[in-house]
Amino acid sequence: VAFNEYGQTICKYSDSGSNLYVYKEEAVKLIVKVLETVVSDLKINFSDISALGCGLAGVSDLNSRDLLLKEFDRLKIVEKSIILSDTESAYQLLCPTGQGILVSVGTGIVCLGRDKDGKSFKVAGRGYDKGDAGSGYWIGKEAIKKLYLNQNILLIDEDMKQIYDCVKKKFNVDDLHALEEMFNDQNNMVFKVAALAENILDYAEKNNDIALSIIQEGTRIVAEYVVCLIDEMEYTNKEAVIAGNGTIIKNDFYRKCLNDALQFDISNLHWIFSDICCAYSSGIIAAQCQKINVSVNDIIKHIN
């Protein structure tokens, strides 16, 4: 998104595949392409940009981050730019006082908390390929794994067949052998695997026992992450307000399963979400670094 010093949104652009850890150089190219498109659509020059905030997944990939900074330097906007994690961007938006708990579940997962003294605590967030459970990618991967483990009943068991048909359609393959070849030939299957989560959640809600078992296992582990975070923060209140971010945690059924898994540790749990996207938060943070005073309220006022 692009907005002016009054908080008026002047341009929006959407694309996918900007995770620096997953897509690396391709992500950098995409980000630059998006910036060039926005500049072109607004009929401005890069020198007209007062501040640029990028809230990105995978910023721990230092090589890709450095490559992106070099591109910003080439475009002569590096001194006006700030790169931060998408989780930090979401936290700044959803926990504006600098205190609270954020559970972000999309393709990946991370639980972030800060106490009244500003001390940070983090659970999970190691990466989609490093054991983080309960995320969109994990849900998709578990569904595919169950197909391979139950090949002898794929066409007999109705629940398994429903998932099998979905996977074949999503990946445009005829059988598991073709799917395996696709995984061997293509490096970046993360987005496609994570996209399965939406279907698995839908099937689980409609009483597909296989899908339900995946969601219940995933949310049970996420509940353990949340409890671990609360313990580390020494939070003893049985009532909690947790900020949520990401497509998976915004799913009502996923959140119901997570609430069920947390009911003995948090008896009264409230979720809060933002009506505006986290891209605004990244831009606001960048603006503040350039001493430009734009607030979330300014953005919301002009959206409404």
Predicted regions and their residues:
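N-terminal short leaders/motifs
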Residues: 22, 26-27, 57-66
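ATP-binding/phosphotransfer module of carbohydrate and carboxylate kinases, centering on a glycine-rich
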Residues: 1-48, 71-74, 96-99, 145-304
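Preference for short coil/turn "hinge" residues that link or interrupt alpha-helices
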Residues: 42, 52, 116, 123, ...
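Glycine-rich beta-strand-to-loop/alpha-helix junction loops that act as flexible
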Residues: 53-59, 105-108, 240-250
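Phosphate-binding/catalytic loop of phosphoryl-transfer enzymes
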Residues: 60-158, 302-303
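Glycine- and acidic-rich phosphate- and metal-coordinating loops
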Residues: 49-54, 84
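Short active-site-proximal "capping" loops at secondary-structure junctions
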Residues: 17-21, 59, 89
